[in-house]
Amino acid sequence: MDTVLGDEARTASQTPGSSPPTIGPQVCPGYGPRLRWANGIAVRGHLKGRTTPHIGKPPPKPSSTASKDSTSPKSVKSPEQNNNPQTASVVDPLEATFPGFPDPTTRTRLLEHYDKQIAGLMVWIDSEKNEYRRLVLPLADQQPVLLLAILAISAQHLAVTTGKEMSFPARARDAAVAMISQQIQKVTGQLAAGYDLGSQIDPDTAVWMLASMLTLANYEMTETETGAAAADWHRQAARTLVNALATTKRDNSPLFHFLRNQLAIYDILTCTTIFGPLSTVEVILPAPDHSNLIFSEFLSLLHKVTVWSRERHEKESSGNFNFADLPITSADARAGFEQARGSTLMAAGVLELPRDARRRDFVRIVDIYHHAALLYTYRVLFHCQVEPVEVNASTMVLFERLNQLEDKRSCLQNLPWPVFIAGTECCDDLERQVFVARMYADIAQDMGFKYYLGILRFLQDLWSNKDTTWTELARHYEASGKKIVAV
C-alpha cells in the first residue's frame, strides 16, 4: 500500500495562527515502505507472498461510559473465560486465520503480563488511572488488531525477560501490520471514489489504529538492538493518522486524546536525536487545550529548540548563519525551561501521589528532564557558546538527581532520554561513563527492551571518538541506516 488515508492534514506545526491545512496524497511512512499490497498479497517486506488476513468486522464496542468506568483488572480473563459473546467473535476469526494463535491459557498469561509488567512502562507515573490498563487493554477484547499487537509485545517482552525466545511475537506483529494496511487500503479506496475522510474513519477505528501503532512501535524496541528504524515506521504512520484526523471531527474521544498526547511525547523526544529532512515536519505537539497535562509546556519548548537547531544547521551549511539570528538567548532558554518545570509540578497534582518515594522521585524526574533539556539546548542550539559554569552546573545536577533516585526500577521508563543526554556530557569522565553504562544496562534488562543496548553502544562509540560531537555521530549513524532514538 503506497498511501495512507489518501489525504493528510498538513497542520503546520499546529500553532495558533497557522495557515489552513492543505490536503494531498501522502505516502504512508509506516506501512508503505515496509509493505505494499497487490490484490491482497504482500509483494515486499516481512509478509512477502502472503495474503492479507481477512478478519470480520469486530462488534461494536461498549459505550464510552462503560469504558470510562473500567478499572485496572486484577486478573485479565481469557476470551473463553469471559461470557461476553462479543469477545468470542473477535477471537474466533483470529484463530481461523492466524496459525498458532495462542490458546486461552496462554492468552490469559500474556494479557496479565501486559497488565502487570508493560502498561506501567508506558506512562510517566504508574497509577490506578493508567489508561493503558483502564481503557486500552479492555479495548483489545473488541479489536483483533490491537489484541494481536498487545499479545505480540507481551510475548516478546516475556521472551526477553525470561530468555525463552518464541516465533509467535514476530508473526503476530506481521499480521497486525497486515491488518492495519488492509484498513488503510480500504479507506484509500473509498477516498479515491470520492468519499471524505470524516465519513470513512469513525472514532472507534481511529482509536484502535492509533493504539495498535503505538503498541507496535514499542514492540520493535523490544525485539532487537536496531529496532529504531522499524519503530519509526509505526511512529510516522501514527503521526500521519493524527494529522489527517485533525481535519475531521473524528478525534474527540477521551481515549484518542490520551493516545494522541502519548504520541506527542514519543514524537517530540524522538525528533531530538534524528535528523532527516522531514523529522520535524508536522510533529504532533501537546494539544493546546491540554496544556495542563504533565510535561506539556516542557515538550512544546523542547520541540521549538529542536526546530531552531535544525534551522541553524541549514543556515550554517549554506554559510548564512549569524549568531544574532537565534530567536532566544541561553538566559531565555533557562527562564523558559524553569517556567515549564513549575508548570509540570503544578500539573502533577492530579496524580495525587502519596508523600513517599514515588512522589520524591517524580520531583527528581522533573529536575532530571529540566537539566537534560538545558544541556541539549546548549549543545544543539548554542553549540556551547554558553558560560562553562552553566554547562557544568546542569551536568552536575543531572548526575546527582539520577544517582539520588530512591526507586530506580519504577522510574526506568522515564530515563532513556535524559540518561542519553548525560552520556553525551561525560566524554572525558570515566567514572560518569561507567555510571551511564550501568544505567542503560539496567534500563535494557529491567524494561526488557533490547534496543537500549544499541544506544549504549552509540555512547561508547562517542566516548572513544573525542573529536566528534554527538549530533555529528548521530547523523553519521542515521546515514548508515541506524537511527538513534533514546525514548
Map each language-model feature to its residues.
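Hydrophobic/aromatic-rich effector regions of fungal transcription factors
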Residues: 114, 133-139, 149-162, 172-227, ...
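Acidic/serine-rich, low-complexity amphipathic helices located in mid- to C-terminal regulatory regions
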Residues: 204, 212-311, 481-482, 487
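Charge-rich, intrinsically disordered regulatory segments
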Residues: 1-129, 169-170, 186-190, 461-486
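C-terminal region signature
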Residues: 416, 425, 429-487
